[in-house]
Amino acid sequence: YDSIREIDNFTDNDNFENILINLICNKISFYIKLISPDTNVFIAFDGVAPVAKLEQQRNRRYKSVFEADILNKLTKQDIIKNNWNTSAITPGTKFMSKLSDKINKFFKNSNKFNVKKIITSTSNEIGEGEHKIYEFIRNNQEYHKTSTTVIYGLDADLIMLTLNHLHIAPSMFLFRETPHFIKTIDKTLEPNKNYIIDIPLFGKVLSLELNNNKEPDTKQKKNRIFDYIFLCFLLGNDFLPHFPALNIRTTGIDTILCVY
């Protein structure tokens, strides 16, 4: 979706898709070179999601089409820059098939990126991208106990998923850009800048605070982090709507932690 916003107006859908696919490959290449891993790279795209999530996605896509149409009619001008149907970014579509083929070919040669191995999991494989990554971590626990892992992604649930795996991989960090509206949330952050989120440090501070500022032992630290993740489910995630009385934008987290 970020790559779509970088492409100017167009008239030819086929040409647009080719430009988009090349842009995606180039952006992934840029991130690999920027982070500079020396062993493995895992590139994961969303495959078919669980049924509950599929229903949510379907509703969201229908709504976005109707909203765009209404917006154009109200303003009496074509304010939607691109008319390409973003529903094509769905497992099983012709576009995703083309993207999968290109990704597999483009990243076939790991030597080009100075790494030992590049693993690709495209939309042809079931499961959401982030879940594929963490499944790989769980299946290779010995390796991740002593290695540093950097995960790039914009989904908010990556923070919770990474916290949840700290007991398996104690040195995990999130790499992400800030969106253009970040100033409305935190004035200290700059839009479109790259940031590394130190998840081990976050987990350490979190477990200390939830343990009444008493240094937790290993079991307590693990349990406090799990408690925090569970409590945050009340604020909603990809699979659950937020609890009606709580909202993350209106001191929801502070309220929950105060009660805890």
Identify the function of each model-found stretch.
Residues 1-260:
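Noncatalytic, typically N-terminal accessory segments of nucleic acid-processing enzymes
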